[in-house]
């Protein structure tokens, strides 16, 4: 069976890994997933990620915990294949009054809502991370 929405699969793997207190989770590799993992690392939501290139490339994420609680309290998919959500720069969401991030796919690549506002860009809202 083919995977219909790989980003939702990635988000679900992160959620399940954190609820099971896993330190390392793995998933099939794609450039989009790598970009999202890079943003999560830059914003301090995960410790690190690496790409293992065997027969099938794999993306491995090192999850981050603080006082035995996951750093990512909530991660939610917004735009999905059945219902794409696009926002202009003025209408980009402010997640948790700036404490969380929205990951946005823009014409300049994948970036946070804060960075998209500085570049005056809108785009597709991929997910919220709190």
Swiss-Prot record:
Transmembrane segments: none annotated. PROSITE patterns: RIBOSOMAL_S8. Keywords: Ribonucleoprotein, Ribosomal protein, RNA-binding, rRNA-binding. GO terms for biological process: translation. InterPro entries: Ribosomal_uS8, Ribosomal_uS8_CS, Ribosomal_uS8_sf. Pfam families: Ribosomal_S8. GO terms for molecular function: rRNA binding; structural constituent of ribosome. Coiled coil: none annotated. GO terms for cellular component: ribonucleoprotein complex; ribosome. Belongs to the universal ribosomal protein uS8 family. One of the primary rRNA binding proteins, it binds directly to 16S rRNA central domain where it helps coordinate assembly of the platform of the 30S subunit. Part of the 30S ribosomal subunit. Contacts proteins S5 and S12. This is Small ribosomal subunit protein uS8.
């Amino acid at each position: 069976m083919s995977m219909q929405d790989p980003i939702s699969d990635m988000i679900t793997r992160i959620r399940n890994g954190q609820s099971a207190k896993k330190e390392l989770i793995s998933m099939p590799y794609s450039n989009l997933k790598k970009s999202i993992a890079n943003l999560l690392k830059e914003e301090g939501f995960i410790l690190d990620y690496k790409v293992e290139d065997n027969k099938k490339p794999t993306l491995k994420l090192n999850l981050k915990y603080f006082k035995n609680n996951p750093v990512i309290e909530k991660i939610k998919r917004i735009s999905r294949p059945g219902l794409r959500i696009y926002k202009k720069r003025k209408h980009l969401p402010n997640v948790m009054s700036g404490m969380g991030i929205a990951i946005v796919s823009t014409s300049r690549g994948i970036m946070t809502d804060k960075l998209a506002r500085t570049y005056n860009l809108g785009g597709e809202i991929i997910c919220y991370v709190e």
